[in-house]
């Protein structure tokens, strides 16, 4: 049975559980605090690791000083095919869901301007880069026939399943300038313009024990639909220590987001069920990247990037919801940490590339009240992988250079495992996070928690021209 009494939890977890939809927290980190890292097939094959190498428009995704490394103009376009598979398991059952999207993942170009001067400045280059990735993600968790909700004395239903369903995209358009000083120091700056579209659903399904019919419930304030724009700026530098070793550093300001949000609400004392609009302002974390590269010869190069978030996500406070979100991130968010390693080996006109990246879990351990797998009682449990977790990426690619024209292909496998909380919803004088159907309400003081394995398989094909 879904219990009607509050259970003891840690202060931070209880505060978080009372106020906010899990999907809002996930999207704050997964969409608004991240950068689309879909570059050229070469960039993607090296796991996005090029902070001390540079040389093309994808440098604007990591270190704009990389524009200054280019000595010839270039334009390229990249087709991306992204596959996303979620396997959600709970109480001995599991559900798989896969989806594939085909998009124009990246377009980039660099114009080089040699400086015929007697100073050490050799080039000033300008670049533009467009990066786009799908945010589509469907996580359907199994039901549990032991989780029974009594709507009244003559009507009871068991949980038949739950789904977080997100549709959308995240894009980043960057304009930058890079300069080359004596082929040993490179500096650059960029302006970045973001756009995001998110349609988010949070739905539970219950089967009637009387007639077997299925009733669907939407969480309060869902579905919601966000159309957002943001901007940031980037500064970077690359220096050659000697012909074989380079170091780089870049800093990206927070992304300042404007979020236009429409959402469904239910059971309002005056308006009943309807849709409302609100505007939000959000600031993502400030990020810094340091890089080192080893260039053994014209045929082999290896690069390592380390990115660290220096601040935490923060909403402009327009009401209680933003205050509670900010308090949650202040207490529980761990600063972003990402390592990227990539290498390239050239055999005449043929290129072989590979890479690896690791992104750390964004949250400290959280304690919540959850139903046991039998669905018969609630227990307090601490999770170090709740909502989101570590992410591992492996990549490789091939390329062929036809002198002025080139073709590159790459593959990425991205994996993550996390605990997925759902179903909790309370209804009292100050808080309404319950689930609603046209005729019934579901409240629960505890979460159901499924184990999710996410695997993404991405393919990229780039056609480019150097001039």
Where are these regions (language model features)?
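Transmembrane beta-strand segments of Gram-negative outer membrane beta-barrel proteins
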Residues: 25-50, 68-85
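Outer-membrane beta-barrel translocator/receptor signature
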Residues: 53-62, 68-140, 168-171
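Residues in and immediately flanking transmembrane alpha helices
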Residues: 16-17, 76, 205
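Short hydrophobic/aromatic segments of transmembrane alpha-helices and their interfaces
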Residues: 49-50, 56-57, 284
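Bacterial Sec-dependent N-terminal signal peptides
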Residues: 1-24, 463, 467
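Alpha-helical transmembrane segments and their juxtamembrane interfaces
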Residues: 13-14, 73, 350, 405
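Outer-membrane beta-barrel porins/channels
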Residues: 20-44, 112-467
């Amino acid at each position: 049975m879904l219990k009607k009494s509050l259970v003891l939890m840690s202060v931070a977890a209880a505060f978080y559980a009372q106020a906010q939809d899990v999907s809002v927290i996930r999207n704050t980190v997964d969409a608004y605090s991240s950068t689309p890292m879909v570059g050229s097939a070469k960039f993607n094959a090296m796991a996005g690791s090029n902070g001390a190498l540079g040389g093309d428009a994808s440098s604007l995704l990591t270190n704009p000083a990389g524009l200054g490394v280019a000595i010839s103009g270039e334009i390229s376009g990249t087709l991306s095919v992204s596959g996303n598979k979620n396997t959600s398991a709970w109480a001995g059952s599991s559900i798989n869901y896969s989806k594939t999207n085909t998009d124009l993942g990246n377009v980039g170009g660099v114009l080089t301007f040699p400086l015929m001067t007697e100073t050490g400045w050799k080039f000033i280059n300008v670049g533009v880069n467009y990066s786009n990735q799908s945010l589509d993600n469907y996580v359907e968790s199994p039901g549990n026939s032991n989780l029974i909700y009594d709507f009244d004395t003559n009507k009871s239903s068991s949980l038949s399943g739950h789904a977080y369903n997100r549709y959308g995209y995240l894009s980043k358009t960057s304009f930058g300038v890079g300069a080359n000083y004596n082929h040993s120091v490179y500096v650059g700056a960029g302006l970045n313009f973001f756009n995001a579209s998110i349609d988010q659903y949070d739905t539970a399904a219950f089967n009637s024990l009387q007639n077997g019919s299925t009733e669907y419930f939407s969480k309060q304030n869902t579905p919601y639909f966000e159309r957002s724009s943001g901007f940031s700026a980037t500064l970077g530098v690359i220096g050659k220590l000697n012909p074989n070793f380079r170091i780089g550093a870049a800093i990206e300001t927070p992304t300042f987001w404007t979020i236009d949000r429409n959402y469904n609400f239910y059971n309002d004392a005056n308006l009943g069920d309807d849709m409302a609009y609100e505007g939000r302002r959000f600031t993502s974390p400030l990020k810094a990247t340091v890089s080192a590269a080893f260039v053994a010869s014209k045929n082999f190069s290896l690069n390592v990037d380390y990115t660290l978030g220096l601040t935490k996500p923060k909403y402009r406070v327009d009401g209680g919801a933003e205050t509670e979100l900010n308090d949650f991130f202040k207490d529980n968010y761990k600063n972003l940490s990402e390592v990227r390693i990539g290498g390239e080996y050239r055999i005449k006109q043929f290129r072989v590339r590979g890479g690896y990246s690791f992104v750390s879990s964004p949250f400290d351990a959280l304690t919540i009240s959850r139903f046991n797998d039998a669905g018969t009682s609630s227990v307090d449990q601490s999770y170090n992988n709740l909502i989101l977790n570590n992410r591992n990426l492996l990549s490789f690619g091939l390329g062929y250079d036809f002198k002025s024209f080139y073709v590159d292909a790459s593959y990425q496998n991205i994996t993550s495992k996390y605990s997925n909380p759902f179903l909790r919803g309370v209804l009292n004088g100050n808080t309404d996070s319950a689930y609603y159907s046209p005729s019934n309400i579901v409240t629960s003081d505890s979460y159901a928690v499924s184990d999710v394995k996410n695997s993404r398989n991405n393919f990229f094909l780039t056609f480019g021209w150097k001039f």
